[in-house]
Regions:
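ATP/nucleoside-binding phosphotransfer catalytic cores, i.e., glycine-rich phosphate-binding loops
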Residues: 2-10, 29, 34, 39-41, ...
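Ligand-binding beta-strand-loop-alpha-helix segment within the catalytic cores
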Residues: 8, 16-38, 45, 92-169, ...
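Glycine-rich phosphate/diphosphate-binding loops that line cofactor/substrate pockets in enzymes
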Residues: 51-66, 238-239
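ATP/pyrophosphate-binding catalytic subdomain of soluble kinases
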Residues: 52, 147-192
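Glycine-rich N-terminal segment of FAD-binding domains in flavoprotein oxidoreductases
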Residues: 59-91
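Gly/Ser/Thr-rich loops at beta-strand to alpha-helix junctions
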Residues: 70-79, 174-177, 251-253
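A glycine- and small-aliphatic-rich helix-loop capping segment at beta-alpha/alpha-beta transitions
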Residues: 83-94, 116-117, 183-192
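Class I SAM-dependent methyltransferase SAM-binding "motif I" and its flanking Rossmann-like core
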Residues: 179-227
């Protein structure tokens, strides 16, 4: 925690600490960060880097004749178009690739929404990734694992059977959630950071701010179009990954500068689960947070 000495004074997020965090010059972020930080010029460059990273881990493991096991998000998403081009053009064999997706929306009863639903992650990935990959690359449906509300241990057991995750890719949500591991919110019940880090695949109710932000990003501001629940991979599976790569592509999403800076420069807190990545094994080397320059620039709070 010595990295934060003189910067952050509160364990929970406070106004005074946020003023400091938001004003740190871009070139000093790495000085105060316990995780690796990479700043790129544009979101297009970010998507290309993310797709290339995904492709390279598959290629490298193919050369070693070992399977590749990665956790993938459905957000950000533009990197998948680039990944399809790389895989098809370079004829990357996918027969030993295992894909574990982070989450999926549920209806109010806790059942999976249909793939035809406009908010379905399964439907989106089928259309924008799986159906576009050349069939001779060898990726089968059995290699694609989604969290299942009817069998919550399925993905956990499969990850364990395969020997763990090589890389977890993801974004960071409005209040710092990774996948749908949102800040725990209960009037009566309390959990510790240790409890949260040991959380496994589970069903959650969306927080109110997630409704708002996701409706703006994906439903034209229609909060009623956002399914109320979700099934998410647990923090345990994420934190047990050998490497974690998070990407903040929020140049046009005005909430992402704060999310990015908190994840990198605020001490671990349940208020913002993204900060818990700092508790990964040797996080300066094993956790990398990438942002485009517009997202990473300091924000002083003045109206734009």
């Amino acid at each position: 925690m010595n990295k934060f000495e003189g910067l952050v004074t509160h364990q929970t997020v406070s106004n005074i600490d946020m003023e400091k965090i938001m004003s740190i010059p871009l070139e000093e972020i790495d000085k105060y960060s316990n995780v690796g930080v990479r700043i790129v010029e544009t979101t297009n460059e970010l998507y290309k880097i993310m797709a290339r990273s995904m492709a390279d881990i598959i290629i490298n493991n193919n050369h070693k004749d070992i399977p590749t096991k990665i956790i993938l998000p459905v957000g950000p998403t533009p990197q998948y178009e680039v990944l399809v081009q790389i895989c098809n053009n370079e004829k990357i064999k996918l027969s030993r690739l295992w894909l574990f997706f982070m989450d999926e929306y549920l209806d109010w009863e806790g059942r999976l929404i249909p793939e035809s639903h406009p908010m379905s992650f399964r439907g989106y990935m089928k259309k924008h990734l799986f159906e576009l990959l050349n069939s001779n690359l060898g990726l089968s449906d059995s290699q694609i694992i989604w969290p299942d509300p009817a069998d919550l241990d399925n993905n956990c057991n499969k990850i364990k059977e395969l020997g763990g995750i090589d890389v977890c890719y993801g974004g960071i949500g409005y209040h710092g959630h990774i996948a749908f591991n949102e800040p725990f919110n209960s009037y009566y019940s309390r959990i510790t950071i240790k409890d949260f880090l040991n959380s496994r695949t589970r069903v959650i109710d969306l927080n109110s701010d997630t409704f708002v932000v996701n409706s703006i990003c994906g439903a034209g501001g229609n909060c009623y179009g956002i399914p109320p629940r979700a099934v998410t991979i647990g923090m345990k599976q994420i934190m047990e990954s050998k490497r974690i790569e998070l990407y903040c592509d929020g140049g046009d999403l005005k909430w992402q500068p704060a999310t990015f800076r908190i994840a990198c420069m605020h001490p671990p807190t349940l208020d913002r689960p993204g900060t818990l990545m700092q508790l990964h094994n040797d996080p300066k080397k094993t956790v990398l947070v990438t942002a485009d320059r517009r997202t990473a620039e300091p924000v002083m709070g003045a109206p734009k």
